[in-house]
A protein has these predicted regions:
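An extended, acidic, His-containing surface patch that forms the Zn2+-binding/catalytic region
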Residues: 105-107, 210-213, 217, 270-336, ...
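N-terminal helical capping/dimerization or prosegment-like subdomains
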Residues: 30-123, 341, 345, 356-357
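Histidine/acidic-residue-rich, glycine-tolerant segments that coordinate divalent metal ions
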Residues: 170-251
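Acidic/histidine-rich, surface-exposed loop or edge segments in extracytoplasmic proteins
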Residues: 46-57, 235-238, 375-383
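Bacterial N-terminal signal peptides
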Residues: 11-22
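Active-site metal-coordination/substrate-binding segment of hydrolases
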Residues: 107-177
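Second-shell loop/turn segments in exported
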Residues: 33-38, 53-62, 140-145, 220, ...
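Short amphipathic alpha-helices in soluble, non-transmembrane regions
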Residues: 249, 359-367
Length: 474
């Protein structure tokens, strides 16, 4: 996942951990961390994962086509025809598409998306070689073992097993694996263009189950939206001069005052259908003082006390509004000279439905200084929209997750960073993060050192995908 390593940490805030004993009464989603997959499909998911981790698909290494070739061979061995699997190169990377024919070939297809690339890892910093899969103490260690080769492996193994068993979906099911989600998302954009006739996207790189310290599930998150990541460059210039002769203006002073205003400003709160569903679904597991505010805001977004309570908590402030904060500043050219220019970076996470240009204009209004220019820094992100919570999709998710963990709270939400879903939502295609990894918060090392996946999640994770697909495409 790009920019925000693991979206579940945003959808289920850390403050909810305090309430785990009251929320963890559902059946365990997995037995012990040492449990390895026992089913043929689960074992195949592990084999795919090991092969994928051993292929260092870091940007610039040219290994995405290599991994795509290995995936293609596996798909062919499961009964896919050669003309149903294609790889489209794009520079040193590319994307893979595999089409599983359905009964109605004219209907719009359902997509399963994941990404083959990973972020860099320095072997000297790791306890184990990050690109040599190691199974130890019930975990598989290696770069990408969690983000996102676990999701890719389980969804792929699930589909291959269904194909071998002769299952035929109601309409075409398409596997679409991108090759640069962690960097430019150029393959994602091209993939979304090529598959723009899709009816629905299921993203293996978002959503998932949260376990408490005892290994019991307390919530499952469904990603149905993303905040737009945006950086803005603020620039102010001044004639400068010798520091012994200060004038009426100073670029550092002007920028400091502007950044103080940005820091103090609160964007208007918003309540969308997704936010409302999240707050109502999360309130039962939240500490009492927060739960009341969540319910109150979901009922009345003008409730001042509820707004104040949620705004005061970093875990929640981003759920109810756009946030913008100063993150970098640079200026001056000599200790004894008045600064001729100062630049600052303001990072924003924009609420779905609000455009980057609207935020830029609001920031200009906030600082109220026409001498300071504000420029959006294009990093490939798109204005974000939410996916409607379709009854057929949410019903299928309920069935698949509750088969694995009866009674578990299923909470829709949005992530603070971008995934491949961004490009599909921008085309009006609903996308849902429905990852099948269940794990404890202290096991989440995506993008970090010693990234790992609990092996016990593989068997039930594959089964979750199969139930989801057979329910949606029956």
């Amino acid at each position: 996942m790009r920019m925000n390593p693991f979206c579940r940490s945003f959808v289920i805030p850390a403050v909810l951990l305090a309430a785990l004993p009251a929320a963890a009464n559902a059946a365990p989603a997995q037995a012990t961390p040492a449990e390895e997959p026992a089913t043929p499909a689960g074992r195949e998911a592990l084999a795919i994962l090991e092969e994928a981790v051993a292929t260092p698909t870091v940007a610039g290494r040219g290994q995405v086509p290599v991994l795509a070739g290995k995936i293609r061979e596996r798909l062919l061995s499961a009964g896919f025809k050669a003309d149903e699997v294609s790889f489209t190169p794009l520079g040193e990377t590319g994307y893979l598409v595999a089409r599983y024919p359905g009964r109605d070939r004219k209907a719009k297809p359902t997509l399963i998306i994941a990404h083959m690339d990973v972020v860099e890892a320095k072997p000297e910093d790791w306890e184990r070689d990050p690109f040599t899969p190691v199974i130890e103490d019930g975990y598989l260690f290696g770069r990408g073992s969690l983000d996102n080769k676990a999701g890719l492996s389980m969804s792929l193994a699930a589909v291959m097993d269904l194909r071998r068993k002769g299952w035929v979906p109601a309409h075409d099911l398409v596997l679409a694996f991108s090759g640069d989600e962690e960097t430019q998302m150029a393959t994602t954009a091209a993939m979304a263009d090529a598959l723009s006739n899709a009816d629905l996207v299921l993203n293996a790189d978002a959503g998932g189950g949260e376990l408490d310290a005892a290994g019991k599930p307390f919530a499952y998150s469904v990603q149905a939206g993303e905040k737009t990541y945006a950086d803005y460059r603020f620039t102010v210039t001044d004639p400068g001069g010798h520091s012994s002769r200060p004038g009426a203006t100073n670029a550092i002073d002007a920028m400091s005052k502007a950044m103080e205003k940005v820091w103090a400003y609160h964007f208007p709160v918003k309540l969308s259908p997704l936010t409302k569903a999240y707050l109502e679904g999360s309130a039962p597991s939240a500490p009492a003082e927060v739960a009341g505010a969540m319910r109150a805001f979901a009922s009345d977004p003008d409730d001042a006390q509820a707004i104040a309570t949620l705004t005061a908590r970093p875990d929640y402030v981003g759920i109810i509004r756009t946030t913008c904060v100063p993150t970098m500043i640079e200026g001056g050219h000599a200790p004894n000279a008045l600064p001729q220019s100062v630049t600052a970076n303001v990072n924003c996470r924009i609420f779905p439905g609000t455009t980057r240009e609207q935020v830029r204009k609001q920031l200009a209004t906030v600082i109220a200084n026409p001498e300071i220019t504000i420029e959006f820094i294009d990093n490939g992100t798109l204005d974000s929209i939410e996916s409607p919570l379709r009854k057929d999709v949410m019903g299928a998710i309920d069935k698949a997750v509750h088969e694995r963990a009866p009674g578990l709270a299923i909470v829709p939400g949005m992530s603070a960073g971008a995934t491949d879903s961004m490009h599909f939502r921008a085309k009006g295609i609903p996308a849902f993060g429905v990852g099948s990894v269940f794990m404890r918060a202290d096991d989440e090392f995506a993008h970090g050192l010693n990234e790992r996946l609990p092996l016990a999640t593989l068997d039930p994770g594959v089964k979750q995908w199969q139930t989801l697909l057979k329910t949606l495409l029956k």
